[in-house]
Amino acid sequence: FDVKGKKYINTPAKYYFEDVGLRNARLNFRQQEENHIMENIIYIELRSRGYRVDVGVVEVYETSNSGKREKKLLEIDFIANKGDKKYYIQSAFEMTSPEKIVQEKKSLTKLNDFFKKIIVVKDDIKPNTDEQGIITVGIFDFLLNDNILEQI
């Protein structure tokens, strides 16, 4: 979903399994990347709470090291919609370096609307909001509190 253009675009599809165990069996237990599994679990949880879920894309223009202006497409893991509520959600297994923090927040900072922008991390942290209005919440709070999106 093109967030700025507010239309569906042709981008590579992402697939999520309703049962992570079936996902693992289908992949012959070869791919055990916790970050992919966490993203899949967030998707399942959003769907079980009644949200319509899309993958978002934000188009930005940046100047490369060579001085050329280049178009880049930044992904937003989930755009969760239910009624008049919309949330932009990034799944970030770890944000252990300043570079990783910038990477995870970049697509969210390019959005110019008032909907909540949330990063779900593996760590058990107290929900917090940064100076850009981006909320970071731990996966356990996200999964165990059905109303977390409204409360943060």
Question: What positions do the PLM features span?
Answer:
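Hydrophobic, well-ordered secondary-structure elements that form the walls
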Residues: 46, 77, 89, 108, ...
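Short, charged, amphipathic alpha-helix that recurs within catalytic cores of restriction-modification
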Residues: 94, 99-118
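Short beta-strand/turn micro-motifs composed of small residues
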Residues: 121
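Domain-level recognition of nuclease-like catalytic cores that cleave nucleotide substrates
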Residues: 124-152
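Short secondary-structure boundary/capping segments
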Residues: 6-7, 109, 126-128
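Active-site ExK catalytic segment of metal-dependent nucleases
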Residues: 77, 81-97, 104
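Conserved beta-strand segments of alpha/beta enzyme cores
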Residues: 52, 116, 133-135
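Accessory nucleic acid-recognition modules appended to NTPase machines
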Residues: 1-86
